[in-house]
C-alpha cells in the first residue's frame, strides 16, 4: 500500500475504517483467548497453526487500516459547489433521460453499487473540474456515452 500520498476520505469513510479496527481488535482478543485454551488442552498443532495464521492476518489488516487513517485527511464539509471536486455529489442525466446521483470519493471508499465512484475511475476523472450544464463524454470499450451534469452538491 502506498503510504506517501495523502488520501481524502469522507467523515463516514473514516468512521467505517475506525469501526473495522475495533472489530479486528475484538476478533484478535477472541482468537488470543482461544489460543490460550487450545494450548492448555494440548489440542492438535494444526488448530494452533490456524489460529496463529488468522491472528497474523488480522494484525496485518489492522496495520494497513491504521496506515490509511494516518495518511488520510477528512474532506471539508463546505467546498466550492461551482465545480466537481473530491467529495462532491453530482447528478447526471444520460441520453435516455435517466438520472444518476454519484459521489466522488478516493479509491479506498469507492463502491459503485452504492453510488460512490473513485476520482481515479474514467468517469471520476471526466467529472473532476466540470461545472453544471457541461456534457461529459465517456468512452468505455467501443461505446461512447454522453452525460449531462445537472447538479453539484
Model-derived segments and spans:
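C-terminal tail/sorting-segment detector
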Residues: 148-152
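N-terminal intrinsically disordered, low-complexity, charge/repeat-rich segments that act as generic
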Residues: 1-71
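Non-DNA-binding regulatory cores of transcription-related proteins
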Residues: 76-143, 147
Amino acid at each position: 500500500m502506498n503510504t506517501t500520498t495523502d488520501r481524502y476520505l469522507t467523515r463516514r469513510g473514516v468512521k467505517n475504517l475506525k469501526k473495522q479496527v475495533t472489530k479486528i481488535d475484538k476478533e484478535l482478543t477472541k482468537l488470543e483467548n482461544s489460543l490460550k485454551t487450545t494450548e492448555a488442552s494440548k489440542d492438535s498443532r494444526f488448530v494452533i497453526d490456524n489460529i496463529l495464521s488468522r491472528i497474523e492476518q488480522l494484525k496485518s489488516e489492522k496495520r494497513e487500516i491504521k496506515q490509511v487513517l494516518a495518511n488520510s485527511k477528512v474532506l471539508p464539509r463546505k467546498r466550492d459547489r461551482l465545480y466537481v471536486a473530491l467529495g462532491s455529489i453530482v447528478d447526471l442525466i444520460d441520453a435516455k433521460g435517466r438520472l444518476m446521483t454519484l459521489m466522488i470519493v478516493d479509491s479506498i471508499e469507492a463502491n459503485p453499487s452504492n453510488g460512490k465512484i473513485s476520482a481515479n475511475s474514467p468517469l471520476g476523472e471526466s467529472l473532476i473540474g466540470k461545472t453544471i450544464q457541461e456534457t461529459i463524454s465517456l468512452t468505455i470499450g467501443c461505446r461512447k456515452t454522453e452525460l449531462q451534469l445537472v447538479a453539484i452538491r
